From Swiss-Prot:
The gene is pin1. Belongs to the PpiC/parvulin rotamase family. It is an enzyme of class 5 (isomerase). GO terms for biological process: co-transcriptional mRNA 3'-end processing, cleavage and polyadenylation pathway; negative regulation of transcription by RNA polymerase II; negative regulation of ubiquitin-dependent protein catabolic process; positive regulation of rDNA heterochromatin formation; positive regulation of RNA polymerase II transcription preinitiation complex assembly; termination of RNA polymerase II transcription. Keywords: Isomerase, Nucleus, Rotamase. It comes from Rhizopus delemar (strain RA 99-880 / ATCC MYA-4621 / FGSC 9543 / NRRL 43880). Residues 39-150 form the PpiC domain. It catalyses: [protein]-peptidylproline (omega=180) = [protein]-peptidylproline (omega=0). Its EC number is 5.2.1.8. GO terms for molecular function: chromatin-protein adaptor activity; peptidyl-prolyl cis-trans isomerase activity; RNA polymerase II complex binding. Signal peptide: none annotated. This is Peptidyl-prolyl cis-trans isomerase pin1.
Length: 150
């Protein structure tokens, strides 16, 4: 992989994964810096569980969502354990349980660039390695599990 000038790959012992470091500015980041002229974009799938505190507490599955944020997080963490243990896939769970309309695509959001998603969602997605599953991520929409796919 070609990196812009002054960028190198280092390994984090704490997180046991590679990251990118700029030897001039001392900036470090999980996502690869892009060469000039390239757009920085990722592809991800997600599973969204909304609560009554969500900015739009309704979905294709439920007209009026009444669960609390705590209940939404419990549902999502149960799904997270099923995915991490290999019992389920994010795609299958998203298809059946996600409160996002992307459920009909197994949670696939397609490619997106910085500035197109809510900031916490964007930051979490760009910090993931391809194939890596996030921990629960809160946005105004609800709580998400995110799988970076490209």
């Amino acid at each position: 992989m070609d990196l812009p000038e002054n960028w190198i790959v280092r390994h984090s012992r704490t997180y046991n994964k590679d990251y990118y470091y700029n030897t001039v500015t001392n900036e470090s980041r999980w996502d690869a810096p892009v060469l000039k002229g390239e757009l920085e974009r990722v592809r991800a799938s997600h599973l969204l569980i909304k609560s009554r505190e969500s900015r739009r507490p309704s979905s294709w599955r439920e007209e009026h969502i009444t669960r609390s944020k705590e209940e939404a997080l419990k549902i999502l963490t149960d799904f997270q354990h099923k995915i991490e243990s290999g019992q389920e896939t994010l795609s299958a769970l998203a298809t059946n349980y996600s409160d996002c309309t992307s459920a009909k695509r197994g949670g696939d959001l397609g490619y997106f660039e910085r500035g197109q998603m809510q900031k916490p969602f964007e930051e979490a997605t760009f910090a993931l390695q391809v194939g890596e599953l996030s921990k629960p991520v809160w946005t105004d929409s609800g709580v998400h599990l995110i799988l970076r796919t490209a």
